[in-house]
């Protein structure tokens, strides 16, 4: 391809068996991408795994809902910024340089967290805390005024959000580009190579998550947050070096213009021309007579007097068909992002066992370790799916389309939210009978006498949902997109994922209002024992259930349209 740079090393190899030929000559490039992604994910989960605990504890003392909202907003930013990252790569820098720049920005933002964790540097960034009088929030003032503020003060909020924004922008750009960049390394080997790359790419993501949750989260909770946040910083530094050294084996191409720019120009032109045509048509009869299935965009084509080529207009039309699928995935992501926010908050109020009593310092099981059940399940099932299940289904013509797999994932994530709601209902009943005071990360939590292991089902259900919905979503976004818009489509896929995170944060803020009161506990900031978190979980399950029904309609319609366009059975498409 013109303008595309092939690898300097390993470009010529002798003939190999069909099973290994898909990656022959590309193993070094794919390995560098997968290793960089593994390290980046280890750093990402090192930030997010215990962020709620970090902000909820001394000396920050954020309210539990505030800490959860901060994490949801951060994760939303990492996804919402993806289209910008895709535009930056396509229009200005190219994917390889955009990834390098984003890793450097990522590293800069991560430096804020060990600085916030160290007392001396924290005082420099945030100033010394102001002493405040302790008030009895349960007793009203004699004059009838409110005795407590509606929300707890958030210490170090500017420095915290500045670090989160920098990391979020870095993550967003990496996220938008490293997936299609990795697929570019094997795209000339056919769809089978692309499918297998996505499977192992997702496997690497979850291996990084396990290493982070297993080691870094333990260090943060039981040793120190300074060391626990220093390790992710080192991981990103190594990822930067790995990607920098891999330039000699990567297949790269220079920026050739952004599909987003063309997309917005075509959308703007079509809307303006349609509005002008409606004004000229008097009562609108002419527009109705001219209308056809794609008349809105066909008017942009050069053959119809417009300024755009046929290919660009057809690419935008393909994009418009894909967007409803992304919209339908928003509730899925809303539930998915509860795993490290409200699920983690629920964990802190369940009985967490001690795992070490060798020394005088007792170590407790990191609450974030439950997230590993999700990651371990994925690590075990993806190779099984890749090597055994998918080949058998393909030989018998039973491999479901990516949209059908997404629907299955939606069902399992709905079950996860429902299971969390049932557990929270039981927890609230038990905490009224017996309360256990447990210290986690220097913070005393009033927990129910109910083991944390009861959360395993909701994490396992989310893990199963990922195998279906997340992997199939990535595959759908890449394979359904026109070649000229693959980065743009991938960016939009993550953009709508970010909207799901913001929806979760917005819902959490809404139910925290005193008028609703599901998550308001103004007599004890950070304590959810006076809240109704189970209502929130049931609400999420209901929203996902309703969306699943709508998605089934959308997916069946899309598969039928794709089958008519491609001339093949719908079950074998995307």
UniProtKB/Swiss-Prot annotation:
Q: Where is it found, in Gene Ontology cellular component terms?
A: early endosome membrane; endolysosome membrane; endosome membrane; lysosomal membrane
Q: Which reaction does it catalyse?
A: L-histidine(out) + n H(+)(out) = L-histidine(in) + n H(+)(in); N-acetyl-D-muramoyl-L-alanyl-D-isoglutamine(out) + n H(+)(out) = N-acetyl-D-muramoyl-L-alanyl-D-isoglutamine(in) + n H(+)(in); L-alanyl-gamma-D-glutamyl-meso-2,6-diaminopimelate(out) + n H(+)(out) = L-alanyl-gamma-D-glutamyl-meso-2,6-diaminopimelate(in) + n H(+)(in); glycylglycylglycine(out) + n H(+)(out) = glycylglycylglycine(in) + n H(+)(in)
Instruction: Give the UniProt keywords, A-Z.
Output: Endosome, Immunity, Innate immunity, Lysosome, Membrane, Peptide transport, Phosphoprotein, Protein transport, Symport, Transmembrane, Transmembrane helix, Transport
Taxonomically, which superkingdom?
A: Eukaryota
Q: What PROSITE patterns does the record point to? A: PTR2_2
**What membrane topology is given?**
Multi-pass membrane protein
Q: Which residues form a coiled coil?
A: none
Summed up, the tissue specificity of this protein is: Preferentially expressed in immune tissues, including B-cells and dendritic cells. Highly expressed in macrophages.
Modified positions (Phosphoserine) in chain numbering = 281, 299
Localization terms from the record = Lysosome membrane; Endosome membrane; Early endosome membrane
What are the disulphide bonds in this sequence? none
Annotated transmembrane regions: 42-62, 69-89, 98-118, 161-181, 197-217, 225-245, 319-339, 364-384, 406-426, 460-480, 491-511, 536-556
Q: What happens when the gene is disrupted?
A: Mice are fertile and look healthy but display impaired cytokine production in dendritic cells. Reduced uptake of L-histidine in brain.
- Pfam families in UniProt: PTR2 (PF00854)
> Which InterPro entries does the record cross-reference, listed alphabetically?
MFS_trans_sf, POT_fam, PTR2_symporter_CS
Q: Which GO terms describe its molecular function?
A: dipeptide transmembrane transporter activity; L-histidine transmembrane transporter activity; peptide:proton symporter activity; peptidoglycan transmembrane transporter activity
Location (main, coarse): membrane
UniProt KW Transport keyword:
yes
GO BP of this protein: dipeptide import across plasma membrane; innate immune response; L-histidine transmembrane export from vacuole; mast cell homeostasis; peptidoglycan transport; positive regulation of innate immune response; positive regulation of nucleotide-binding oligomerization domain containing 1 signaling pathway; positive regulation of nucleotide-binding oligomerization domain containing 2 signaling pathway
- Function of the molecule: Proton-coupled amino-acid transporter that mediates the transmembrane transport of L-histidine and some di- and tripeptides from inside the lysosome to the cytosol, and plays a key role in innate immune response. Able to transport a variety of di- and tripeptides, including carnosine and some peptidoglycans. Transporter activity is pH-dependent and maximized in the acidic lysosomal environment.
What does the record note on quaternary structure? Interacts with TASL; leading to TASL recruitment to endolysosome.
List the PANTHER family hit by this protein, alphabetically: OLIGOPEPTIDE TRANSPORTER-RELATED
By sequence similarity, the record places it as follows: Belongs to the major facilitator superfamily. Proton-dependent oligopeptide transporter (POT/PTR) (TC 2.A.17) family.
Name used for this protein in its record = Solute carrier family 15 member 4
Q: Which organism is it from?
A: Mus musculus (Mouse)
Originating gene: Slc15a4
